[in-house]
Amino acid sequence: MIEYGAEFPSVVQTAHKENNTVPIYAFVPKDRKDKVPVILILHYWGARDIKAERSMADRLAERGIGSVIVTLPYHLGRTPPGYRSGQLAIQPSSEQLRATMSQAALDVKRAIDFVEGRPEFDSAKIGIAGTSLGALVAALVYGVDSRPRLAAFILGGVDLAEIMWSSSLVVEARDALRRRGYSYERLQLELTEVEPLTYLHSRKESSAFVIGGKYDTIIPRSSTTGLIGAFDNPRTLWLETGHYGGIFIQSRVFKEVANYFETEFSGKPYLPPRRIYAPTLRIGVQAAYPTGFDIGVGIDLWKSNDRGDLVVVGLLTPRGPQVFFGGRVSQGLSLGVSGSTTRVGFGLFWSRVL
């Protein structure tokens, strides 16, 4: 695979000069004989490197498909001094959220301009793929720009206001919005111009591949199903994980993304697998009588349904391995029995699926 970098000025100029230049990284199959299809790859929020995106680029190159990784606003080399990568991308202000999403979409559109001018890429076969925040931006771009023919959304969704109002990752920003008098309805109204659903009706008949996490608390499941519902015939794949558990099957997921683009660009319909095995991993705290408090990491051994109304979890705790069996009380909270080879307790188990 041949790799080269480039950069261009952002369409939007901000108060932070580092954020005003867009680095991109292009990857071309080494043995290409003609122009190749190309995928714009967008990374997740807070990315500190592009290792995952390079892995996707490798998978695509194996299928004779090129790719271009686009650095999103306030991330990686666009991060101003004194801030973490992505820290300024999501702020408790509808005005700032609109500005960042608009800048991201315009930067990706300019990256598509770049692709169209390169002799190694086939401008008639452009796709877009994003993970998490990258999937949100990809959905917006797919709605406002007709040049990408195909799109893959990994752990993404729609309804930005719902994500801000429900995600377990933006608690501080959500609390700040509430202190400023925001409601979900007000935020939804003020984000209309950067909401993917505002524009995706134009792509209702277009191809799309949506990969969601059944137990995702960062991108709410309702947001992912909303994205699925924006298309007439989307390809879908639900992982038995939360937002982070997919890292354990990243290679398999990227393989399916590459399968999707290769198949659909060839003019054939892509059929996703019914499921990809992924362990459902949890971190949790239990309070049981008479055994007391414990923290642990665990794996689901059995559950009665997708909601986990009844669940058996194998746990590794500082006191040794344990098994918890219980029933769901509310989101993330179960009541039941936990035990090891030497003791048994009855109580509560709070957990979050990774």
Regions found by a protein language model. Give the residues of each.
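Short beta-strand/loop motif that positions the catalytic acidic residue
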Residues: 203-204, 209-212
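Catalytic histidine-centered segment of alpha/beta-hydrolase-like enzymes
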Residues: 242-254
